[in-house]
């Protein structure tokens, strides 16, 4: 990573970074239109991987860059692109990352949003191709969306160059509306490495009947991580991601606990007797009655936990706001066992049915505890949506 000659300054990290990235390519986010893709295509904005810099790598159009970079504008206007969220939802914040764009970053951006129906989108699929600009036909198709009139979630604001200490810019959003599409404006031109949209997925639960079997914890259905003890190698929000994990980095993995005994001992059921554990608290997308649980340690072959347990509780929205002010995940939550301590194994899908569960009540939150440490790729809570009692 490039270092700026000035002294590094640590910046506070906003709370919304614990939420899901609704625009990531891994959850279906896509670029529908971009005014210009000369040096690097807009699709790079939504990549899940971290940006990289390849010294000495050039294309016929210029320096290869891992992001979206437009040509130096020599005509009136500014550059912009339209992004379709992979998971429609309520947006709580944005992250614009200009890593490695030091003398060619976009100096200013603004962000607009809309909630569109599928039939309103008439844009043709894009080609991921550098050295191009939008054609007249593509501009005409994009103009039909009237995106310049979409709601502003972020007015024009400055970005900073892509040095280590200044590349990440965070913007909080105060909106309770559901959005499906964004217009990212850069002024007037330049590059951004990654663009992330943090929020909570929101589906239409009115179309879901009481007998519909759903993964109540999935990010697509509105599940979200609220807190955790450790996320050294991978964030627990990955537990509720789409599909199975693509690698270890796509799961929740903690550091090795330093309080583990010098010599490990297990009980008759194979559960290690250790003092330490790690935990993550998540909110279901909809309260419900959980009847089946899946714990997937896919890819964690030498670093899965020995055991896992899940506690649950039911909190109404007003109670959620009240306990949020306590600053911890014990006071006011009234946790009850949902899944007793269960031994889990490396690189395996574990399925638990209702006969294995200790709680048969409507719940809204879960606390996942692993011991002593390690990694889990996915957790699914299957059941039926129900109103809170």
From Swiss-Prot:
One of its GO terms (biological process) is allantoin catabolic process. Pathway: Nitrogen metabolism; (S)-allantoin degradation; (S)-ureidoglycolate from allantoate (aminidohydrolase route): step 1/1. Keywords: Hydrolase, Purine metabolism. Gene3D superfamilies: Galactose-binding domain-like. It catalyses: allantoate + H2O = (S)-ureidoglycolate + urea. Belongs to the allantoicase family. HAMAP family: Allantoicase. This is Allantoicase. It comes from Xenopus laevis (African clawed frog). The gene is allc.
């Amino acid at each position: 990573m490039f270092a700026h000659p000035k002294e590094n300054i640590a910046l506070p990290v906003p709370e919304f970074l614990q939420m899901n990235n609704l625009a990531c390519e891994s959850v279906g986010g896509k670029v529908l239109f971009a005014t210009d893709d000369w040096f690097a295509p807009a699709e790079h904005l939504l990549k899940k991987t971290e940006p990289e810099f390849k010294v000495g790598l050039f294309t016929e159009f210029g320096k290869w860059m891992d992001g979206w970079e437009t040509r130096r504008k020599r005509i009136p206007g500014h550059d912009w692109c339209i992004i379709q969220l992979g998971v429609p939802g309520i947006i709580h914040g944005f992250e614009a990352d200009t890593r490695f764009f030091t003398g060619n970053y976009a100096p200013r951006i603004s962000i607009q949003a809309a909630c569109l129906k599928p039939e309103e989108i008439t844009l043709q699929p894009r080609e991921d191709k550098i050295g191009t600009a939008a054609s007249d036909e593509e501009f005409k198709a994009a103009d039909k969306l009237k995106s310049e009139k979409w709601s502003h979630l972020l007015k024009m604001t400055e970005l900073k160059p892509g040095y280590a200490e200044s590349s990440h810019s965070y913007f909080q959003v105060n909106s309770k509306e559901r959005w499906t599409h964004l217009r990212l404006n850069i002024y007037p031109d330049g590059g951004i490495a990654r663009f992330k949209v943090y929020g909570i997925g929101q589906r239409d639960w009115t179309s879901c009947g009481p007998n519909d079997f759903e993964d109540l914890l999935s990010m697509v259905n509105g599940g979200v991580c609220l807190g955790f003890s450790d996320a050294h190698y991978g964030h627990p929000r990955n537990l509720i991601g789409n599909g199975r994990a693509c690698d270890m980095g796509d799961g929740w993995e903690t550091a090795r606990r330093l309080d583990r005994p010098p010599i490990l001992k297990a009980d008759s059921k194979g559960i290690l007797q250790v003092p330490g554990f790690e935990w993550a608290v998540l909110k279901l997308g909809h309260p419900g009655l959980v009847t089946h649980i899946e714990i997937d340690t896919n890819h964690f072959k030498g670093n899965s936990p020995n055991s896992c347990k899940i506690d649950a509780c039911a909190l109404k929205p007003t109670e959620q706001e009240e306990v949020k002010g306590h600053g911890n995940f014990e006071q006011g939550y009234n946790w009850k066992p949902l899944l007793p301590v269960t031994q889990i194994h490396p690189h395996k899908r574990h399925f638990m049915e209702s006969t294995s569960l200790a709680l048969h009540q409507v719940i809204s939150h879960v606390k996942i505890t692993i011991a002593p440490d390690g990694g889990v790729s996915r957790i699914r809570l299957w059941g039926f949506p129900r109103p809170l009692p």
